[in-house]
């Protein structure tokens, strides 16, 4: 059995997808790359098909990250699932996954992990460091102290059996599906935030919308999901 299935949802990512996929060429652990596209009208799919045999394209006209991730996971054969975004970079990728799997080997109750998420250092601002520092601390506290599963879509690593046990992502959620997934995973095992499992990303939404607006959207969506079971926003638009 393949050790790791890496699922990458895409939508108009022709500028990032090649670099994102090729970084896994430095990973010696047996793995497969699955690109799940939401109907890109640029060269994303064309590029992806030169990099991996497993590319799926959603054609229902209303792609969401949850639908794309579930579609990718349906093609997976690995013992573990890694969901990451199409613009994420993982520093020292070989040691990154060696550390991750060592944690699963050491604790058989562990079903999923996540870690710090930081913006590329060359474009990171003071406000990025402040608000992401707070976010990372909150995710750590909720997972490691309260035992309440919380994860974000930029990096999620889990046992595939646990993912299947809870029927994957809730396709009824337009956003916040990553938080919901880890919340449910915590009912079947441990979820943990690992400080040494940091990833980097370009912060396009943070810089494109600005932190005040983004924090308002995030907070409102979380409250709406808790109270009403669905998101406040009706569409999660990509920022490119």
Predicted regions and their residues:
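Glycine-rich, basic loop-to-helix element that forms the pyrophosphate-binding segment
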Residues: 60-76
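Short aromatic/hydrophobic "clamp" motif used to bind/position activated sugar donors
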Residues: 81
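Conserved donor NDP-sugar-binding/catalytic core segment of glycosyltransferases
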Residues: 92-126
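A recurrent flexible, glycine/aromatic-enriched loop bordering the glycosyltransferase active site
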Residues: 119-126, 139-158
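A conserved acidic beta->alpha catalytic loop
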Residues: 37-45, 88
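Short beta-strand/loop segment that forms part of the nucleotide-sugar
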Residues: 30-39, 58
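Acidic donor-binding loop at a coil-to-helix junction in glycosyltransferase catalytic cores
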Residues: 175-181
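Short, well-formed alpha-helical segments that are part of the catalytic scaffolds
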Residues: 12-26
